[in-house]
């Protein structure tokens, strides 16, 4: 009985994966003056002139800042802080566990 249920779930999963893969791998193609066909998913960017391409890349704001590229620069010099929230007052990964026999902490019982 359990094997039949696993087989049905496996086939159902396979059908869902096949359907979603079929939807993502279909590309609409366009041909440009006998230069061959290319997909419409951003592959035309290299065919544009450099000024237009540069402006589109600058408008996307997906670049590394000059401050991050400086030599010998640590993004956050505060010890124990995350690089992403360096200015906040909280520690990035605070230690919250207590002392126990498992962690081999020294206890003074007297």
Swiss-Prot record:
Subcellular location: Secreted
Signal peptide: 1-23
Disulphide bonds in the chain: 76-86, 99-105
Site (Required for proteolytic cleavage): 54-55
Gene Ontology MF, one: hormone activity
UniProt keyword terms in alphabetical order: Disulfide bond, Hormone, Secreted, Signal
Post-translational modification note: Proteolytically cleaved, probably by S1P, a subtilisin-like serine protease (subtilase).
A single GO BP: calcium-mediated signaling
Propeptide: 24-58
Main location: secreted
InterPro entries, per database record: RALF (IPR008801)
GO CC annotation: apoplast; pollen tube
One Pfam family in the UniProt entry: RALF
Its job: Cell signaling peptide that may regulate plant stress, growth, and development. Mediates a rapid alkalinization of extracellular space by mediating a transient increase in the cytoplasmic Ca(2+) concentration leading to a calcium-dependent signaling events through a cell surface receptor and a concomitant activation of some intracellular mitogen-activated protein kinases.
Annotated family: Belongs to the plant rapid alkalinization factor (RALF) family.
Record's protein name: Protein RALF-like 19
